Amino acid sequence: MPEEAETFAFQAEIAQLMSLIINTFYSNKEIFLRELISNASDALDKIRYXSXTDPXKLXXXXXXXXXXIPNKTAGTLTIIDTGIXMTKSDLVNNLGTIAKSGTKAFMEALQAGADISMIGQFGVGFYSAYLIADRVTVTSKNNDDEQYVWESSAGGSFTVKADNSEPLGRGTKIXLYIKEDQTDYLEESKIKEIVNKHSQFIGYPXKXXXEKERXKEVSDDEADDEKKDDEAKKDMDTDEPKIEDVGEDEDADKKDKDGKKKKTIKEKY
């Protein structure tokens, strides 16, 4: 029987800060990704330092990297790192029940007109996720604990429970359920642009990943058949996202020398 989720109340100042982030208009919302990548970098630093004295700490996932994966179908943007990750108590304490010393100071600064982009300097950058998401899940696996998932749609509380989904090995996966008016952040080109702008400041590879596709010319009839095949396979497709270099699109409609109308479709490979 699956473990019941435990519900926790956000510490009062954190709840106030989240309300301020959610209910105030900020123009430079993209800073959320810089903050989450920065947190991923810190987690990678921690496991790297710890492994210097105990190399076995890296065994569960040796590669040190961060990836951002937009998924238009699910309406999510996922940020994954192979850093030190969080135990259950880390999730409870660090993401809601114990206010960082900068929480109140940052709220006061915001109300005095400070820019939202300063959030990281106060140690509460994680909550910037709620600039563009109305629900956030944080799945994490630390070497010293089982895998747990934290979840909150704000509203004053969050849940934590044991997670039996795909094992991370070690690290953290943050899934942002993007608000309906923020779907720009599901565009791979937009994510790549922000990652390129901010990831130059971290010492690890930060990739934007997507399902890889290529253009293939087919006749209209073949295109219909391909579409049916693709729909039949969609539920069974469990391939990992792949890094994609975006190239130029070719003309969508062409005719071959027999006069048949050609269509360019996307083919997974």
Swiss-Prot record:
GO molecular-function term, one example from the UniProt record: ATP-dependent protein folding chaperone
Database matches in Gene3D superfamilies: Histidine kinase-like ATPase, C-terminal domain
Keyword Ubl conjugation (UniProt): no
Keywords from the named record: ATP-binding, Chaperone, Cytoplasm, Nucleotide-binding, Stress response
Biased composition (Basic residues): 260-269
Localization in the cell: Cytoplasm
GO cellular component, one term: cytoplasm
PROSITE patterns to which the protein is assigned, alphabetical: HSP90
Residues at which ATP binds: 39, 81, 100, 126
Major site of localization recorded for this protein: cytoplasm
UniProt region (Disordered), positions on chain: 206-269
Composition skew (Basic and acidic residues), residue ranges: 209-218, 225-245
Family: Belongs to the heat shock protein 90 family.
Function summary: Molecular chaperone that promotes the maturation, structural maintenance and proper regulation of specific target proteins involved for instance in cell cycle control and signal transduction. Undergoes a functional cycle that is linked to its ATPase activity. This cycle probably induces conformational changes in the client proteins, thereby causing their activation. Interacts dynamically with various co-chaperones that modulate its substrate recognition, ATPase cycle and chaperone function. Required for piRNA biogenesis by facilitating loading of piRNAs into PIWI proteins.
Subunit structure and binding partners: Homodimer. Interacts with shu.
Protein name listed in UniProt: Heat shock protein 83
Gene field: Hsp83
